[in-house]
């Protein structure tokens, strides 16, 4: 179930209260990862490199100059809650900032203004049983679009390459740096 209540921890909480087993992450992991700002702050505590960002709350404003000064261009402006890249804009010029903020506030009451980080996009899944934790090899995400937007995610505008085309050393580092701290804490 996409969005609320399936991805934000509510459904898991209901199942926990009724003692119904389920096969996805628990309440805490879902709640933290559904909120991009909270998730970023949480991961920073484990030394994970996170893009510089600003959080705007409904009714709060920011000037174009302040965005450029504090975050730089290009940047991403997106709702802090939610998924599927709804309300996300890759902003390249000052003139795009305010319309992108309005668009993001159309999806949520908090908006994240986040610096663009250039590089190879990776994702890495894992699951835990009573006996062990299994970590999958990193997958490289190569979008055909400007960024990994809704169209790329749901309409086949992406290549997902497993294992990722990165060095063995970088593969080991990514597994340690990303999967280890987060899997034990979430």
Where are these predicted regions, by residue range?
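Conserved N-proximal alpha/beta basic substrate-recognition cap immediately N-terminal to
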Residues: 1-52, 57
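Short, contiguous strand/loop micro-motifs
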Residues: 25-27, 87, 168-169
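Residue-level detector of conserved catalytic or cofactor/ligand-binding positions
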Residues: 174-186
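Phosphate-binding site of ATP-dependent enzymes
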Residues: 92-170
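Short glycine-/acidic-enriched loop or helix-start segments at secondary-structure transitions
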Residues: 7-11, 86-87, 123
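Hydrophobic alpha-helix-in-membranes signature
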Residues: 20, 73, 78, 136-137
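Active-site nucleotide/adenylate-binding loops and adjacent lid/helix of ATP-dependent enzymes
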Residues: 32-120
């Amino acid at each position: 179930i996409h969005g609320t209540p399936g991805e934000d921890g509510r459904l898991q909480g209901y199942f926990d209260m009724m003692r119904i087993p389920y096969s996805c992450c628990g309440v805490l992991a879902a709640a933290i990862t559904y909120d991009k700002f909270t998730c970023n702050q949480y991961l920073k505590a484990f030394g994970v490199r996170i893009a510089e960002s600003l959080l705007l709350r409904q009714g709060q404003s920011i000037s174009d100059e302040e965005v450029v000064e504090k975050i730089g261009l290009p940047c991403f402006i997106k709702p802090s809650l939610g998924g599927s890249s709804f309300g996300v804009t890759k902003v390249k010029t000052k003139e795009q900032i305010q319309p992108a903020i309005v668009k993001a506030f159309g999806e949520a009451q908090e908006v994240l203004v986040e610096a663009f980080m250039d590089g190879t996009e990776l994702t890495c899944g894992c699951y835990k049983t009573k006996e062990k934790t299994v970590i999958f090899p990193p997958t490289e995400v190569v979008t055909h679009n400007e960024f990994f937007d809704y169209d790329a995610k749901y309409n086949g505008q992406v290549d997902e390459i497993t294992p990722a085309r990165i060095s063995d050393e970088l593969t080991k580092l990514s597994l340690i740096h990303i999967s280890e701290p987060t899997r034990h804490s979430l």
